């Protein structure tokens, strides 16, 4: 009994220390024009993620003359239920991603086009890591943007694991800036994108495949407004937020969590879309 109580006390003390660290990070958060960088690489699990997360910040980098490169790991085909339609959806989403990159003024995106429903396979993961290593070597970023590794979407978490594998062998000194749709620690950087929101909204409309599934533009607006209300300065009506870590800390943190395990991929997973019945 005493041993169990001691273990529980240690676990509670560790939890309190972690919450204290989070509070200190929150109090130290900085409202910045954009996270410091001279070269930027943004990694998207799906086409549209680089707009939804850091799209307004990308616009600010472009306006400042800072090169922004983007890559997308999967083809996003699994947003439709019918397998017979998935190849067509993949092509459509690739065209949308290129159109949005042109609209934002960022570089031509690198589309790995790995079938979304195959990324859980080890061979596909190895392929993604190799492609990520090439993208990192080509872009030579000092700021790397990815989804938060405990994001509620399992594929976002898996892509973070693959990014960490690619970074593990890199000696590059860079800062990893994570964004999230759901779970998130207190942000390191808050970026006021009030002025950029209209253009981000217009870019979101170019993802017509997503707008047909849900009110995608409203989702973009809501996330920006929520972040402004929760973390932004009083004058901001739209913000993007980022949790920043040095490369080595990010790699150690992510690779310690087994995010590529079947259990992790199943945790919080969205229901798998059923095959539409034959007619």
What are the roles of these predicted feature ranges?
Residues 226-253:
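Glycine-rich phosphate/pyrophosphate-binding loop and the adjoining helix
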Residues 186-232:
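A conserved mid-domain beta-alpha-beta active-site/ligand-binding segment of alpha/beta enzyme cores
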Residues 1-174, 178-179, 198, 205, ...:
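Active-site beta-strand->loop->alpha-helix modules in alpha/beta enzyme cores, enriched
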């Amino acid at each position: 009994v005493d041993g169990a109580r001691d273990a529980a006390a240690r676990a509670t003390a560790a939890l309190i220390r972690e919450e204290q660290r989070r509070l200190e990070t929150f109090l130290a958060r900085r409202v910045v024009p954009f996270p410091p960088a001279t070269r930027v690489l943004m990694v998207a699990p799906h086409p549209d993620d680089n707009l939804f997360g850091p799209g307004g910040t990308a616009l600010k980098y472009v306006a400042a003359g800072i090169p922004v490169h983007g890559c997308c790991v999967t083809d996003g085909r699994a947003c439709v239920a019918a397998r017979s339609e998935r190849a067509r959806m993949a092509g459509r989403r690739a065209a949308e991603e290129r159109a949005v990159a042109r609209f934002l003024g960022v570089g031509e995106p690198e589309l790995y086009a790995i079938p979304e429903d195959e990324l859980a396979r080890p061979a596909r993961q190895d392929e993604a890591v190799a492609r990520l290593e090439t993208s990192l070597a080509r872009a030579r970023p000092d700021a790397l943007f990815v989804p938060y590794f405990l994001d509620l979407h399992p594929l976002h978490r898996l892509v973070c694991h693959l990014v960490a594998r690619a970074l593990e062998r890199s000696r590059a000194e860079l800062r990893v800036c994570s964004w999230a749709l759901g779970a998130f620690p207190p942000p390191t950087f808050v970026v006021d994108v009030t002025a950029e929101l209209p253009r981000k909204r217009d870019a979101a409309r170019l993802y017509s495949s997503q707008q047909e599934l849900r009110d995608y533009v409203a989702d973009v607006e809501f996330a920006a407004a929520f972040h402004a209300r929760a973390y932004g300065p009083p004058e901001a009506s739209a913000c993007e937020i980022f949790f920043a870590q040095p490369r080595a800390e990010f790699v150690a943190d992510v690779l310690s969590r087994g995010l590529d395990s079947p259990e992790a991929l199943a945790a919080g997973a969205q229901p798998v879309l059923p095959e539409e019945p034959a007619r």
